């Protein structure tokens, strides 16, 4: 029965051949042609050709090996095979915050951008202030929340930009900005003068103790104190700056100069705002009358940028120790406010953490003044500025026999002839961060000027920021 059915099918499929031959049988060539099976596999010549993914896998189901032959690249084969087997797991864009998705067999992998983590990059990695200052241009703090996000803020005269990171000025002459390129620094040491004591005035300090406005009589320039607390008589051991470059108008706009009753310059200072000048406590006893000049860059020339101001009140830190120069800091309240310009601008006050963790971890700071051009030399006619590297604390302590307290730090060069010198005392030590200059220290004391193996010693402002801000509120 099956044979008859097959015969009928053959007859139906080949009516022309049957009629042509007039019988049941057909020629061998025709029969072979009809019964020949078409192979799916490549012919010999096709096997010699490079694989084709369309031919190998899209026309019919293929194996991974056939796909590899088509791509001739393991990585591309894996990418294709993962989608070919079970579809593209990345088609739904599962990776958040710009993460890149890579398909797998029954799964996917997200490569997250910096700052994000999780299977789908869905979690924001909290930034910390110790890492690149939290990307803040100025101050950085950690928000007290579950994720502990970074919060940026700005010093006085600035406000946060829309990005929450940058600080933009909201005043005409913002602190810490130099409108012209700057040159290096120099330092001055107060000259000897007789002074008379005046009345004291008390104001509350941050710790509840009494802050005194004090003038004491002295006939000597300040010298660094020995470790045993007694004074030393070496006339070459003085407070100071040496070997800087000239500071042109507007390049050191926060520089202030203290003038005695004879019209002589004896110390430096830093402009903090229109009412207050920061200086060293040991400068205060150098004259019974103090005036402050700002905007000056040449002692023998009228630049028409300088103005002179009278000291109304003087605040010396209540814990200042003259024998050791500890807590060597004072503030001068001016009777007439300073008018700011492109030549006269205050330096910025930092926050303590910002000063300690960011500013003082910079390579160097800047000091400026009209100090002596070399040890026992004459005072500089021109304002000078000098870059001074921060010095490791242990190196600083090992370089001197005098006490280096927690309220001091060292800066300068071990062998180069560059340093602060006599007459620069009380002057500014500022540090630049993202084109803004912040006060980091006060020129305090040193052993000679630019001596080999010796460094300049500065009052560490971050230890006194609360005190400074408390006094500046005493208007």
From Swiss-Prot:
| Catalytic activity field | Selective cleavage of Arg-|-Thr and then Arg-|-Ile bonds in prothrombin to form thrombin
Please give the start and end residues of each transmembrane region: none
In the UniProt record, does the keyword Ion transport occur? Answer: no
Tell me what PTMs the record reports for this protein. The vitamin K-dependent, enzymatic carboxylation of some glutamate residues allows the modified protein to bind calcium. The activation peptide is cleaved by factor IXa (in the intrinsic pathway), or by factor VIIa (in the extrinsic pathway).
Signal peptide (from-to): 1-20
Which superkingdom does the taxonomy of this entry point to? Answer: Eukaryota
Subcellular localization, as worded in the UniProt entry: Secreted
* One Gene Ontology biological process: blood coagulation
For this protein, the record's InterPro entries field holds: Coagulation_fac-like_Gla_dom, EGF-like_Ca-bd_dom, EGF-like_dom, EGF-type_Asp/Asn_hydroxyl_site, EGF_Ca-bd_CS, GLA-like_dom_SF, GLA_domain, Growth_fac_rcpt_cys_sf
Q: Where is this region: Disordered?
A: 216-237
Gene Ontology terms, cellular component aspect? extracellular space
Please name every pair of cysteines joined by a disulfide bond in this record.
57-62, 90-101, 95-110, 112-121, 129-140, 136-152, 154-167, 175-348, 247-252, 267-283, 396-410, 421-449
Q: Which residues carry this modification: (3R)-3-hydroxyaspartate?
A: 103
Could you say which EC number(s) this protein's record lists?
3.4.21.6
Query: Taking every annotated instance into account, which residue ranges of this chain make up the domain EGF-like?
Result: 86-122, 125-168
Keywords (alphabetical) are: Blood coagulation, Calcium, Cleavage on pair of basic residues, Disulfide bond, EGF-like domain, Gamma-carboxyglutamic acid, Glycoprotein, Hemostasis, Hydrolase, Hydroxylation, Protease, Repeat, Secreted, Serine protease, Signal, Zymogen
Taking every annotated instance into account, which residue ranges of this chain make up the domain Gla? 41-85
Annotated positions of the 4-carboxyglutamate modification: 46-47, 54, 56, 59-60, 65-66, 69, 72, 79
Q: What does this protein do?
A: Factor Xa is a vitamin K-dependent glycoprotein that converts prothrombin to thrombin in the presence of factor Va, calcium and phospholipid during blood clotting. VAP cleaves the fusion proteins of Sendai virus, NDV, and influenza virus a at a specific single arginine-containing site, and plays a key role in the viral spreading in the allantoic sac.
Family to which the UniProt record says this protein belongs: Belongs to the peptidase S1 family.
**Subunit composition and interactions:** The two chains are formed from a single-chain precursor by the excision of two Arg residues and are held together by 1 or more disulfide bonds.
Put simply, this protein is called Coagulation factor X
State the species of origin.
Gallus gallus (Chicken)
């Amino acid at each position: 029965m099956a044979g008859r059915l097959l015969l009928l099918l053959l007859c139906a499929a080949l009516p022309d051949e049957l009629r042509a031959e007039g019988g049941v049988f057909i020629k061998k060539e025709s029969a072979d042609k009809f019964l020949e099976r078409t192979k799916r596999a490549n012919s010999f010549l096709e096997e010699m050709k490079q694989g084709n993914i369309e031919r190998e896998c899209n026309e019919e189901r293929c194996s991974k090996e056939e796909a590899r032959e088509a791509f001739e690249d393991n990585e591309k084969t894996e990418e294709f095979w993962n989608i070919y087997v079970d579809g593209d797991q990345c088609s739904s864009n599962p990776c958040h915050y710009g993460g890149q998705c890579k398909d797998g067999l029954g799964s996917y992998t997200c490569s997250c951008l910096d700052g994000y983590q999780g299977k789908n990059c869905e979690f924001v990695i909290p930034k910390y202030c110790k890492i690149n200052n939290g990307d803040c241009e100025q101050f950085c703090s950690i928000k007290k929340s579950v994720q502990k996000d970074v919060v940026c803020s700005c010093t006085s005269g600035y406000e946060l930009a829309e990005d929450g990171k940058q600080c933009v000025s909201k005043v005409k002459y913002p602190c810490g900005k130099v409108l012209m390129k700057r040159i290096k620094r120099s330092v001055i040491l107060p000259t000897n003068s007789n002074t008379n004591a005046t009345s004291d005035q008390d104001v509350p300090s941050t710790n509840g103790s009494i802050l005194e406005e004090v003038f004491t009589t002295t006939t000597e320039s300040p010298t660094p104190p020995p470790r045993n607390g007694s004074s030393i008589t070496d006339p070459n051991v003085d407070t100071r700056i040496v070997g800087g470059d000239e500071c042109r108008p507007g390049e050191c706009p926060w520089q202030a100069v203290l003038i005695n009753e004879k019209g002589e310059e004896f110390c430096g200072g830093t402009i903090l705002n229109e009412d207050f000048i920061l200086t060293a406590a040991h400068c205060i006893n150098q004259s019974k009358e103090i005036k402050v000049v700002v905007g000056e860059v040449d002692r023998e020339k009228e630049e028409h940028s300088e103005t002179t101001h009278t000291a109304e009140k003087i605040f010396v830190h209540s814990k200042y120790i003259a024998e050791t120069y500890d807590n060597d800091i004072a503030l001068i309240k001016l009777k007439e406010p300073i008018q700011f310009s492109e030549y006269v601008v205050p330096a910025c006050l930092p926050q303590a953490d910002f000063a300690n963790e960011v500013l003082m971890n910079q390579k160097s700071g800047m000091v400026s003044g009209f100090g002596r051009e070399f040890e026992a030399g004459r005072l500089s006619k021109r304002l000078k500025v000098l870059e001074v590297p921060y010095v490791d604390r242990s190196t600083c302590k090992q370089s001197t026999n005098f006490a280096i307290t927690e309220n001091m730090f060292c800066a300068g060069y071990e062998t180069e002839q560059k340093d602060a010198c006599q007459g620069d005392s009380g002057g500014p030590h500022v540090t630049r961060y993202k084109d803004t200059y912040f006060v980091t220290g006060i020129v305090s004391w040193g052993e000679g000027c630019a001596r080999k193996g010796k460094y300049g010693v500065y009052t560490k402002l971050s230890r006194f920021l609360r005190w400074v801000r408390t006094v500046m509120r005493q208007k």
